[in-house]
Every structure is written in structure tokens, then in C-alpha cells.
């Protein structure tokens, strides 16, 4: 009742390769909510990395739409870097408070991709990462409130940015649909998706190690396949099921997805995992809850091996069905496991640790049951949509009422030119040589990043140094 109207603005797409719904300018969701599709550059589908040159056009058309309405919105809430770019312009032009949610952040993605061995120029070419980071910086400077999913985002991810202002940041975990994602009910094996999965497997009754994500390099699917393929014990205990989007002809997919799927299939062939790994070509959105429940019914585990995971909605969905989780230690999974106590965290690049944890979880039936029960209970307590909405409105209300002042930062970036102190240290002897003091050192660096140039000296190769820094949570240096 406190919300009069919600307009979700997104790009209008006219393309025979996607549903005709995406071409509809207006889609009414309820009496008080609708999707408004705004014209933006060319009509066809474009991946988000290719949208940057069209965003000013989107902002102009969005401004025309907003000014044509009976009343202007009280707030603008932008999600991801591209919408942050648009939101900063609309906020300035209309003098409306901006809220911003970055979700996955460019600086964090670049750091993790470098650590996994991807070259800097490849990252730039593939992801337009510099433009993305610039847009994120600008949105952080303009936004009155930054909404995050986890505390880890505030400290470890946003803390890497020039416009890091923790006093403006608020944690509101996303919710999940508990009517759709529910515990096992016995109907799972009657589904078509169960038959699709079984046709890959020699022993389909084994527990399932499940991975479900987009075919994206950042999701680190190949490392999971390698971890499985290198562990004879794990291969004896469980099947591996990979749900990585939908595909007809891989050659028609974008280059990034082609590369990931090619790596996965080559790895399956290298370790001769035929009959042990399922990788169905198609699934529907309605199949996803069933897939989780199939894995839970088998006594399996859901794995999210992503290099970094801003929140981890799939982990919440899996937990709601009673499926224990094993997840990357980088990002939102930390908060989820702290709240739900339903799994373990891993270094996503440590294949042995990944396999060992899976074996431990699959082998101990009593512990598995405890993790499954904890997950169902924890999701209901912490991750329902009603709890999410209530917390969000408590943050928005003082912004709308103007009971808290609108805060816009001076949009002058803080490169090293504006730092008034510097700290340089050796990686192996100084930092790794004193693990007891390392946590305190990291805390001090994080608290002073806005005024301090931080440098690391090392004889290691770049990929080796970044991997060690990630393992010990050492902030990315300026030099």
C-alpha cells in the first residue's frame, strides 16, 4: 500500500531470435507495476558489452517518457553498470534521487579473470571493462544510496572503487519464490527433464553433483569438470550434471559461450567422462526447481564454482529445495552460508579442495541431512520476498521523504595523484611470511584506500601473484 507505481524500464528488442514480448512497448504486470520497453539504438538483440554506444540514446528516450507521465518518480533505482550510466544522467536532469545496485562489479571481475589467466587485452576487448568501471564509478558518486546483497560486497568489492562510501551503502538480500522452490515432493522423476538427464548416465541413481549457470568464463565450469575428472573417488560416488543455458547449434551462440562450452566438452573427452556427466541441450524455466529437487532427492550437492559471485541466487534456490551447497568463497555465498549453515566455501581455483569437500558432503549421510534441513529453514527465515520488500522500503522511505539529505559526491576521480601517503611491501616475505598479522594489515589498507597508494613488490609471475593475493584476500594494489 505504500507503493503507488513501479515502472521497470528496459531496452525494447525487435528480433526474430527472441520472443515477440520483448518488442512490446508496455507490459502491464499488475495495477501498480509495468515493464516499459524503451527504444535504444538498433532494434535487434545485442549483448550487454555491445550496448555502451547506445546508452545515451536510451537515456534521451527514457527522459521523454518520464516527462510525458502525470507525475515524475520519487526515486530512480539503476541496476548494473549500463543502467547506472543511464540513471546518473536521469538523476541529474530530473533532480531525482538515484539508488544504485552494481551486482557484479567490473574491478572485481577483471581481478578474478586476470588471476585465472585471461590476458588484460582480452578482458578489455571481450567485456569493455574500462567503460564499465567508469560507469560504475560515476553511479557510485551520484547515488544517494547503494543497495547491496551482502556485507562482503561493501567491504571487498565496492572498497576497490574511488567513490567507495560505505556510509551510503545498505544490505538488502534478494528473496526467492518459496512456492516454486520447495522441498522434494516425490513427483520429480515423472518430469521430462529427468529423462533428458538420465540418457547421459550409465548409473542414473547415483547422487548428483549439480552445476547450473550461464556458459560464461566467469562461472568457472571447466574447473569443476576437471576437479571431478581428476578424482577417482568422486567419480565412483556421484554423477555430474551441468546445466549451462540452452543451445541448438553451438556455432550460432556468441563467442564467449562457444568458448566455454568447447572447453567443457573437451575436458569431458580428455577425462573420458562419458556416462558420468550429463549436459542436456535444453531446459525450460519451469524445469529449474525440478532439477534442484532431483539432485536433492539423489542425496547430491549443488556447486557454484564461480570466480566471484555477487550474491548467489541459485544457491538460495537450491537451499530452498533441501539441496546442500558448495560455493565460491568470493562474494555473497559467505553471507548465505553464515545465515543458512547448509554448506561450505571453497577456493574456486583449488580443484583438490573442491573434490575433497564434495566427497565429504556426499559420504556423511547424517551431516547431509542436517545441511539439507538447515538450508530449507534458513531460506524461509532470511530470504523470502516479503522480508526483502519490507527492508527495502525502510531504506527508501527517508529518501523519498527527504528526511535524509541528498548526497552527491564531487565527481573527481581519486587516482594516485590525490593520494597523500603510500605503502609498498613484499608479497612473499612480508605479507605471506606473517599470517597472524595479515588480516590486520588488510583491514588497515581497506580503511585507507581512498588516500593511500598501495604497492606490492614480487618476483612472481602476474597470474601467480594474483592467485596468491586472492587466496589470502589481499586487496588489489595500485602498483
Describe the function of each predicted region.
Residues 2-4, 231-234, 440-452:
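A short, Lys/Arg-enriched amphipathic alpha-helix followed by its capping loop at the start of a domain
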Residues 419-434:
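Asp-based phosphoryl-transfer active-site loop
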Residues 329, 427, 459:
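Fold-independent oxyanion-binding glycine-rich loops
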Amino acid at each position: 500500500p505504500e507503493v503507488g507505481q513501479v515502472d521497470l524500464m528496459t531496452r525494447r528488442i525487435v528480433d526474430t531470435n527472441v520472443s515477440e514480448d520483448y518488442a512490446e512497448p508496455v507490459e502491464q504486470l499488475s495495477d501498480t507495476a509495468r515493464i516499459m520497453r524503451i527504444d535504444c539504438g538498433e532494434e535487434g538483440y545485442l549483448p550487454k558489452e555491445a550496448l555502451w554506444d547506445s546508452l545515451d540514446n536510451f537515456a534521451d528516450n527514457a527522459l521523454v517518457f518520464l516527462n510525458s507521465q502525470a507525475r515524475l518518480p520519487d526515486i530512480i533505482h539503476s541496476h548494473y553498470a549500463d543502467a547506472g550510466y543511464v540513471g546518473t544522467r536521469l538523476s541529474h536532469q530530473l533532480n531525482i534521487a538515484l539508488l544504485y545496485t552494481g551486482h557484479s562489479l567490473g574491478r572485481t571481475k577483471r581481478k578474478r579473470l586476470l588471476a585465472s589467466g585471461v590476458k588484460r587485452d582480452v578482458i578489455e576487448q571481450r567485456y569493455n571493462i574500462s567503460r564499465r568501471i567508469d560507469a560504475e564509478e560515476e553511479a557510485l558518486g551520484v547515488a544517494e544510496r547503494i543497495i547491496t546483497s551482502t556485507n562482503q560486497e561493501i567491504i571487498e568489492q565496492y572498497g576497490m572503487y574511488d567513490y567507495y562510501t560505505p556510509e551510503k551503502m545498505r544490505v538488502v538480500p534478494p528473496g526467492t519464490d518459496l512456492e516454486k522452490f520447495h522441498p522434494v515432493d516425490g513427483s520429480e522423476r515423472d518430469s521430462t527433464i529427468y529423462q533428458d538427464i538420465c540418457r547421459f548416465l550409465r548409473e542414473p541413481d547415483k547422487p548428483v553433483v549439480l552445476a547450473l549457470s550461464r556458459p560464461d568464463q566467469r562461472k568457472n565450469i571447466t574447473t569443476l569438470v576437471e576437479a571431478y575428472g581428476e578424482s577417482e573417488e568422486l567419480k565412483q560416488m556421484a554423477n555430474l550434471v551441468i546445466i549451462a543455458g540452452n543451445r541448438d547449434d553451438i556455432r550460432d551462440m556468441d563467442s564467449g559461450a562457444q568458448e566455454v562450452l568447447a572447453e567443457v566438452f573437451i575436458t569431458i573427452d580428455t577425462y573420458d567422462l562419458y556416462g558420468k556427466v550429463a549436459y542436456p541441450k535444453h531446459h525450460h524455466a519451469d524445469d529449474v526447481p525440478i532439477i534442484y529437487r532431483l539432485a536433492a532427492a539423489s542425496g547430491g550437492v549443488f556447486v557454484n564454482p564461480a570466480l566471484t559471485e555477487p550474491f548467489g541466487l541459485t544457491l538460495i534456490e537450491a537451499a530452498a529445495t533441501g539441496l546442500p551447497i558448495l560455493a565460491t568463497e568470493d562474494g555473497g555465498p559467505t553471507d548465505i552460508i553464515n545465515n543458512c549453515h547448509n554448506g561450505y566455501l571453497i577456493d574456486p581455483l583449488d580443484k583438490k579442495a573442491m573434490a575433497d569437500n564434495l566427497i565429504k558432503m556426499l559420504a556423511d549421510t547424517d551431516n547431509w541431512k542436517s545441511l539439507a534441513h538447515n538450508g530449507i529453514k534458513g531460506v524461509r527465515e532470511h530470504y523470502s520476498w516479503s522480508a526483502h520488500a519490507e527492508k527495502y522500503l525502510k531504506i527508501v522511505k527517508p529518501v523519498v521523504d527527504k528526511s535524509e539529505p541528498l548526497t552527491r559526491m564531487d565527481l573527481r576521480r581519486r587516482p594516485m595523484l590525490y593520494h597523500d601517503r603510500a605503502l609498498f611491501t613484499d608479497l612473499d616475505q612480508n605479507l605471506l611470511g606473517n599470517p597472524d598479522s595479515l588480516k590486520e594489515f588488510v583491514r588497515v589498507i581497506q580503511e585507507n584506500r581512498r588516500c593511500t597508494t598501495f604497492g606490492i613488490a614480487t618476483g612472481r609471475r602476474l597470474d601467480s601473484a594474483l592467485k596468491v593475493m586472492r587466496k589470502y584476500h589481499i586487496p588489489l594494489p595500485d602498483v
